[in-house]
Amino acid sequence: MELAICKTDLSATKFMLPPALPSSAAIGSSSAVASTASHFLDKAAHELFQLNAINGHLFKSPASSHLNSVGSPSILSQLNGIGNSGNHSGQVSTMRLKKNRKVTFLSSLVESKNIFIKEEPIHGCKDLCSLSDISDHEASLEVPTALPPLTPGTNRKVNEVLKASFASWEKEVQKCNITKDPREWTEEHVIYWLNWAKNEFSLVSMNLDPFYKMKGRAMVDLGKEKFLAITPPFTGDILWEHLDILQKDCEKPNEDIVHGNSFESATTASVCGSDHQVANYPNETHANSNNSSINSRLSMDYVTSAGNSDNKNFHRATPHSHNGYNTSNTHDRINNSTPPQQQQSQQPTVNGSGSASSNNNNSMLPPAVQQSNNENNNTSSSNTNNSSNNNNNSGGSNNSNAGSNNNNNNNNNINFMAAAAIFQHHLKEEPGTQNGNIGGYGGGSNSQNDPTDLSSYGLPAHLAAYGGGSGSGPTGGRSSGGGGDESDYHSTISAQDHQSQQSSGGNGSGGASGGSTGNSNGYLDSSSEFYGSYAGRNRFHDGYPPEFTPYDAQSFQSMGPQPTAMDQWGAAHAHQHPAAYMSTLGLDKGLLGGYTTQGGVPCFTGSGPIQLWQFLLELLLDKTCQSFISWTGDGWEFKLTDPDEVARRWGIRKNKPKMNYEKLSRGLRYYYDKNIIHKTAGKRYVYRFVCDLQNLVGHTPEELVAKYDLKIEKKDVD
């Protein structure tokens, strides 16, 4: 066996060798040193042989080793020779020569082994049982499946869960006829609501004593902090959250009510509550037999008790009537905070002396009938004596009666906005409705007594046209009015809508009986929806004299100077079928309803209810507007090259600063079903007049282009 001696830095203690002794000590104890060295070398050799036996091979030095290898005598024999030699000093020197050498194991001869430490597997731990495993399965079945568990991991918000839990209150509201607005609750309603919440949410510790003799208004006015102070912990949060949700539901804008037709009104009319109703009349003691007919025609879902309403929210009508252009106060200005819409609703009432019924129907008659009677008698009279202004109008005799201001038709506060939406829905589904006797109310049909004439309540006229703006014609059908869906585009309280529509009832009938509109044009006579909205809209401002506008403030903007009243839309033609006078007037003056002209171009200056199609036609005939709207040269087809500019001008015209193309396009889409304007397929912002516009204006598109020196630029439209 051979051992390889490598690297010369072998320490003296590597093989537990004793440290080198001084020469004097070594000479004195040579035998002891020899015996000790021999003992340690024998022990080291024995351990090396055991290590070789384990590894199965000897440690051999490589051939390239530069170290001095030991020859035939092994290291054991050399070390043993030290003990047997007599020269002790030579033995010590030999040990000193070799003490710095170090024995190492060559890496190429040592087998490497991977030593594994015992570890737990990554997924070896057993999961703890979840709460769902511990919980009672039978108890979990009692949780409503519609409500998600109130855990942090749920995807539903807590507010949505609360709304779902409050859904049962809607049934209680309908069952007990409770108003949705908590501010209108009586003391009984408050206690009923608290008892419902106590049973619904198992509020055992709920104390109702602080809420006795407390109305809904007072409860809401407490505020959240005071409300929580008189309710148990956590219970008050639930109750206040419900109150907050109910109030927010009642404060939604009107556009959510009228099926998405969001007209921008100056009022903040709401679904529920007399605080926000468009028209609320005081509750008089006069008997009225028309309440049953109103309730039978209108949805009972919108009927609330008048006794629960706060009388301070009512606005009484003016106790005098308008005879011609009355220069006195025409609407109640006592309450300066009254919104313009409510001021407009304060119109005088009319008692139909020729009606079949004997009861007082003052507020059932629209203000337009009274105004029509007065204007037909004497439009310049300022006499306020109502008994001296009896006149005949198309077979019906009506007498203005301001002394009996019997606004007793509103014993139940009816949400007329929602009611009009119901009429709108039903009338849309009636095919072939005809516009019979728009303004005359004659021909044996006592239209004045129609309890569904919503215009008498101050309802915006484009909605009232569905119910009250229609008369009973020869066919017995009801006119749809054709104006409800255009609510975004015809402002209900436009600052430029004036008293120029004075003769709202007389000219439309054109005859004594039969309800004919007096229109000689065959095509337009058969399409009453085309112009039916004029009757409803003109009646809305009939009660205003020329010096007053629906807004007391200055109007937003105007496209031109305000002309005189006789130069306005419908100065002598209000409620007349447009074709009846458009065909009799010249193009410059009568193309768009008696507009004034600027440089030979018809220009509607802002008075009277202009419709969107008329406005577009006006722009198309204005040479200065060709940069944003122009004819394409294909018949009556036109393109909005800059739709935002068109929408901006339309907003200026209708006093709607927030008008944009999205809202304007809704008005254009409304014309699709009425066959007035169609969208050209495959072309962006390109539309076409599909009505008989040529027969209406008496000119072809080419003639209009030549007359007004318009340029037709055929462009590639995408």
From Swiss-Prot:
Lineage of origin: Eukaryota, Metazoa, Ecdysozoa, Arthropoda, Hexapoda
The entry summarizes the disruption phenotype as follows: Embryonic lethal showing loss of photoreceptors. In larvae, RNAi-mediated knockdown results in a transformation of type II neuroblasts into type I neuroblasts, elimination of intermediary neuronal progenitors (INP) and generation of extra type II neuroblasts; in the ventral nerve cord, results in increased numbers of type I neuroblasts. Simultaneous RNAi-mediated knockdown of the zinc-finger transcriptional repressor erm, the transcriptional repressor E(spl)mdelta-HLH or the transcriptional repressor dpn restore normal neuroblast numbers.
Known InterPro entries for this protein? Ets_dom, ETS_fam, Pointed_dom, SAM/pointed_sf, WH-like_DNA-bd_sf, WH_DNA-bd_sf
Give the modified residues of type Phosphothreonine: 151
Classification via SMART domains: ETS, SAM_PNT
Reading the lineage from the top rank, the first entry is Eukaryota
Recorded source organism is Drosophila melanogaster
Which Pfam families does this UniProt record tie to the protein? Answer: Ets (PF00178), SAM_PNT (PF02198)
Any one GO CC term of the record = nucleus
Note down the stretches annotated as region Disordered. Answer: 303-412, 430-521, 545-571
Name of the protein described by the UniProt record: ETS-like protein pointed
- Note the SUPFAM superfamilies from the entry: SAM/Pointed domain, Winged helix' DNA-binding domain
- The UniProt regions of compositional bias labelled Gly residues, in chain numbering, are 466-484, 505-517
Annotated family: Belongs to the ETS family.
Compositional bias ranges of the Polar residues kind: 320-329, 552-561
Q: Molecular function terms in GO for this entry?
A: DNA-binding transcription activator activity, RNA polymerase II-specific; DNA-binding transcription factor activity, RNA polymerase II-specific; sequence-specific DNA binding; transcription cis-regulatory region binding
User: What ranges are recorded for DNA binding?
Assistant: 610-690
- Quote the subcellular location field of this record: Nucleus
Primary site of residence: nucleus
Which intervals hold domain PNT? 164-250
GO biological process terms, semicolon-separated? cell dedifferentiation; cell differentiation; compound eye photoreceptor cell differentiation; determination of adult lifespan; determination of genital disc primordium; epidermal growth factor receptor signaling pathway; epithelial cell migration, open tracheal system; epithelial cell proliferation involved in Malpighian tubule morphogenesis
Q: Write out the entry's keywords from A to Z.
A: Activator, Developmental protein, DNA-binding, Nucleus, Phosphoprotein, Transcription, Transcription regulation
Bias (Low complexity) occurs at: 337-363, 372-412
Q: Which CDD domains match?
A: SAM_PNT-ETS-1_2
Q: Function of this protein?
A: ETS transcription factor with a prominent role during development of the eye and the nervous system. Required for glial-neuronal cell interactions at the ventral midline which are necessary for the proper elaboration of commissures in the embryonic CNS.
